[in-house]
UniProtKB/Swiss-Prot annotation:
Essential for the degradation of glycogen in lysosomes. Has highest activity on alpha-1,4-linked glycosidic linkages, but can also hydrolyze alpha-1,6-linked glucans. It comes from Rattus norvegicus (Rat). Keywords: Disulfide bond, Glycoprotein, Glycosidase, Hydrolase, Lysosome, Membrane, Signal. Residues 28-69 form a propeptide. This is Lysosomal alpha-glucosidase. The gene is Gaa. Residues 1-27 form the signal peptide. Substrate binds at residues 404, 600, 616, 674. It comes from the Eukaryota. The keyword Lyase does not apply.
């Protein structure tokens, strides 16, 4: 073991012992269980909290002399220790506002922001830790087969109650690109998130990182071996580990930070004293508040195109504070500290390494990528039928019809009313006969107000003990849409079986195809319960993060209520995830096909089971624009099936807004139009013919691109790729892409530049270096059964970019979509449903580089069966273009996909007019070449599942 003295910032008394670690571990594979854990199993199979920290270039500090008294409140900071750069000050009063006397009694420094020479800074703490503030000391460091262990000791308590004075540190060098360390209480078992994480038994052979420890104050320093950049340095502020307050700070190597969802903000988070609160909450999206999901993972971009990520697996209420130094502080109200650091080195790899831990996204059924339509206010089957008929008559594709609460009897789950929905089952059968699917809302809260025997879900749930209980052991009763309600405990194995039974029984009446699970933060219309909440430390913790409403019980249930695995205090942020797991499981066992679940509440690992929509957004240009970074954020978090309510949910949309939102929504991975009961209807056919034509053009483009989109989801499912991705994921070495969040990519090949402001007929977007072809050059409508739209207005066919911002024409009927040179994408004739579009002929769009090369692939299966990869029931074909020749490679071919007909190949970037075109050696005479666009269109008659070769000269 190599021990050395660190380079400290001051020449003062104390040791900064650094131990350099260069060991590593074999990659394990994560499996997130269905939470069917017995209490005795939990200790061995849970991994606890994953914590994230961003690295920083500064060296770890060395403590100055400090005269330690018996109690923390008697400490006094040495005046010279308070000379800390304002942006590097770490808050010593996170729990409450305090006076100078109270601050100094904590042993901290007091410097009002107004007294700083550079002027006041909003958010800058007045009371902050001196570098000498006592922390833990590292002792008994020893090697293990997979890393290191050590003991951490603290000699004086902090100002939070129930400090844990002795801690255990375990460091695991799990893979070459993944470091894992945990800080626990060795004498008392604490709650750990029930996520089964990779188990690694040996050290990685060639890690990309080195690990060092500061002995006193204790800290972990993680460096990137290549260049020595510090990625994580926890010595910048003292470690806290009390029963209900855990705090860990780290420096960051840059101010370019993304992640930490869910929030309404730009893609890159501000480090100007920004607090992000993670405590799932039913609240309409707005800036600066905790929203529906909690994802304690961040990705940091570094100079030179490198990136790393950090994940803190902790489901307790927490704040994450970003400050300008730059630095980050985690403050959690419970659990343990369990930190994963992902070394990348490029951003794309960071996301994949994170998903190696939390799980790769599920593969959605093909129909789930079509258009979904819903509205709160479809109050009868007659209205729903009319909506579907109107969509068909006006030639708008519709794959999935939804219902909100309207279908229910007294707004109770697993019922339908006999007034407007007496023939509900018949309506769903009719949708199926038309090649469509059906989904409806299901809230978790179960009505408890009826007499015994009147409502089977509650009666059966009560008998089987599936509900969350209060301090007396009785079901906690809150209030949601049906009135008095109980809340299922989805961490209880019995609840999973009960939920499956309820889903199966209702499906036997109404054969729905997917589930929309809403209100699952869980939402509660009263605070806590009808009886209130007990006055205890879980309801009134010593530290309350910045939650909307100021209390953990606000708009949800009591924190001290009891669930199978732990208290709701610990499990709250997992409620939506556990319901998604239960719903996915129930659909698999009920329908026997691929599940399709869309959930409002999410947590880390959610994408493995379900998709997400962004909640009750407003019909406003602001929320239209914010939807882009939110879609990108969730793709980075491993939830690629995500979308916002097209045209907005709350408030009345306008025609222009709805057209522009539909154009952008055509490139949401999950495409749904949905709005509120009190807002004007906004189905596409409600607007003028001009608006309808513009929207229909966007629909046509999406449906033509579905084979490419489906192939992207396959990549997400098997490799951890993103579907919609920020530009920096493909171009990390171009700093101009880092903050772009008004554009998005579909995979590596398509760049979408939407109009996000009113009254605009042009749009400005960033084009990374290279050639970009306008997708309007590729004819798609002739392949399908939809009517042709009006001819496209003049457009710039090819963009030759040096890496620059460009202004493009964008009339109301146009969304700019560009195909990146070097890629081949599959297309298919668009139709009114995916049932029909999957039968249409296919095409290839080939975008050549200046050297005349391109590549791509197509994944295809039956679109809904389970286990297609395991059974080999799929087709995977790759395409490549080089030297004026296009060939395919049959990676794996079955009947599903092998018989797809290829009818058109459009080649972009053909600089010289060809005189001869061959398809499998046979001359093609009816090709067309455009000298203006440099495009070559070749009609062919080929099968995707057979080898082919296309030549031109």
């Amino acid at each position: 073991m190599n021990i050395r003295k660190p380079l400290c910032s001051n020449s003062v008394v104390g040791a900064c012992t650094l131990v350099s670690l260069t060991t590593a571990v074999i990659l394990g594979h994560l499996m997130l269980r269905e939470l069917m854990l017995l209490p005795q199993d939990l200790h061995e199979s849970s991994s606890g909290l994953w914590k994230t920290y961003r690295p920083h270039h500064q060296e770890s500090y060395e403590p100055a002399p400090l005269h330690i008294q018996e109690h923390a409140e008697q400490l006094r900071a040495v005046p010279t220790q308070c000379d800390v750069t304002p942006n590097s000050r770490f808050d010593c009063a996170p729990d409450k506002g305090i006076t100078q006397e109270q601050c100094e009694a904590r042993g901290c420094c007091w410097v009002p922001a107004g007294q700083v020479l550079n002027g006041p800074v909003m958010g800058q703490p007045w009371c902050f830790f001196p570098p000498s503030y006592p922390s833990y000391r590292l002792e008994n460091l020893s090697s293990t087969e997979s890393g290191y262990t050590a003991t951490l000791t603290r000699t004086s308590p902090t100002f939070f109650p129930k400090d844990v004075l002795t801690l255990q540190l375990e460091v695991l060098m799990e893979t070459d690109s993944r470091l894992h360390f945990m800080i626990k209480d060795p004498t008392s078992k604490r709650y750990e998130v029930p996520l089964e994480t990779p188990r690694v038994l040996s050290q990685a052979p060639s890690p990309l990182y080195s690990v060092e420890f500061s002995e006193e104050p204790f800290g972990v320093i993680v460096r990137r071996k290549l260049g020595g950049r510090v990625l994580l340095n926890t010595t910048v502020a003292p470690l806290f580990f009390a029963d209900q307050f855990l705090q860990l700070s780290t420096s960051l190597p840059s101010q370019h930070i993304a992640g930490l969802g869910e929030h309404l903000s730009p893609l890159m988070l501000s480090t100007e004293w920004t607090r992000i609160t993670l405590w799932n909450r039913d609240v309409a999206p707005s800036q600066g508040v905790n929203l529906y999901g909690s994802h304690p993972f961040y990705l940091a971009l570094e100079d030179g195109g490198l990136a790393h990520g950090v994940f803190l697996l902790n489901s307790n209420a927490m704040d994450v504070v970003l400050q300008p130094s730059p630095a980050l502080t985690w403050r959690s109200t419970g659990g343990i500290l369990d930190v994963y650091v992902f070394l990348g080195p490029e951003p794309k790899s960071v996301v994949q390494q994170y998903l190696d831990v939390v799980g790769y996204p599920f593969m959605p059924p093909y129909w789930g990528l079509g258009f979904h339509l819903c509205r709160w206010g479809y109050s009868s089957t007659a209205i729903v039928r009319q909506v579907v008929e109107n969509m068909t008559r006006t030639h708008f594709p519709l794959d999935v019809q939804w219902n909100d609460l309207d279908y229910m009897d007294a707004r109770r789950d697993f019922t339908f009313n006999q007034d407007g929905f007496a023939d509900f089952p018949d309506m769903v059968h009719e949708l199926h006969q038309g090649g469509r699917r059906y989904m409806m809302i299901v809230d978790p809260a179960i009505s408890s107000s009826g007499p015994a025997g009147s409502y089977r879900p509650y009666d059966e749930g009560l008998r089987r003990g599936v509900f969350i209980t209060n301090e007396t052991g009785q079901p906690l009763i809150g209030k949601v849409w049906p009135g008095s309600t109980a809340f299922p405990d989805f961490t209880n194995p019995e609840t999973l079986d009960w939920w499956q039974d309820m889903v199966s029984e209702f499906h036997a009446q109404v054969p729905f195809d997917g589930m929309w699970i809403d209100m699952n933060e869980p939402s509660n219309f009263i605070r806590g319960s009808q009886q209130g909440c007990p006055d205890n430390e879980l309801e009134n913790p010593p530290y309350v993060p910045g939650v909307v409403g100021g209390a953990l019980q606000a708009a949800t249930i009591c924190a001290s209520s009891h669930q199978f695995l732990s208290t709701h205090y610990n499990l709250h942020n997992l409620y939506g995830l556990t319901e998604a797991i239960a719903s996915s499981r129930a659909l698999v066992k009920t329908r026997g096909t691929r599940p399709f679940v869309i959930s409002r509440s999410t947590f880390a690992g959610h994408g493995r089971y379900a998709g997400h929509w962004t909640g009750d957004v407003w019909s406003s240009w602001e929320h239209l624009a914010y939807s882009v970074p939110e879609i990108l954020q969730f793709n980075l978090l491993g939830v690629p099936l995500v979308g916002a309510d097209i045209c907005g949910f709350q408030g009345n949309t306008t025609e222009e807004l709805c057209v522009r939102w539909t154009q952008l929504g055509a490139f949401y991975p999950f495409m749904r139009n949905h709005n509120d009961l009190n807002s004007l209807p906004q189905e596409p056919y409600r607007f003028s013919e001009t608006a309808q034509q513009a929207m229909r053009k966007a629909f046509t483009l999406r449906y033509a691109l579905l084979p490419y989109l489906y192939t992207l989801f396959h990549g997400a499912h098997v490799k951890g790729d993103t579907v919609a991705r920020p530009l920096f994921l493909e171009f990390p070495e171009d700093p101009s892409t880092w903050s772009v969040d008004r554009q998005l990519l579909w995979g590596p090949a398509l760049l979408i530049t939407p109009v996000l402001e009113p009254g605009k007929t042009d749009v400005t977007g960033y084009f990374p270096k290279g050639m970009w072809y306008n997708l309007q050059m590729v004819p798609v409508e002739t392949l399908g059964s939809l009517p042709s739209s009006s001819p496209a207005s003049s457009f710039r066919s090819i963009v030759h970019s040096k890496g620059q911002w460009l202004t493009l024409e964008a009339p109301l009927d146009t969304i700019n979509v560009h195909l990146r040179a070097g890629y081949i994408i599959p297309l298919q004739g668009p139709s009114l449903t995916t049932t029909e579009s999957r039968k249409q002929p296919m095409a290839l769009a080939v975008a050549l580089t200046e050297s005349g090369e391109a590549s791509g692939e197509l994944f295809w299966d039956d679109g809904e069966s389970l286990g297609v990869l395991e059974r080999g029931a799929y087709t995977l074909v790759t395409f490549s273009a080089k030297n004026n020749t296009i060939v395919n490679k049959l990676v794996h071919v079955t009947k599903e996909g092998g018989e797809l007909q290829l009818r058109e190949v459009t080649i972009l970037g053909v600089t010289t007019a060809p005189t001869q075109v061959l398809s499998n050696g046979i001359s093609v005479s009816n090709f067309t070449y455009s000298p203006d666009d440099k495009s070559l269109s070749i009609p062919v008659s080929l099968l995707m599942g057979e080898r082919f070769q296309i030549d031109w000269s």
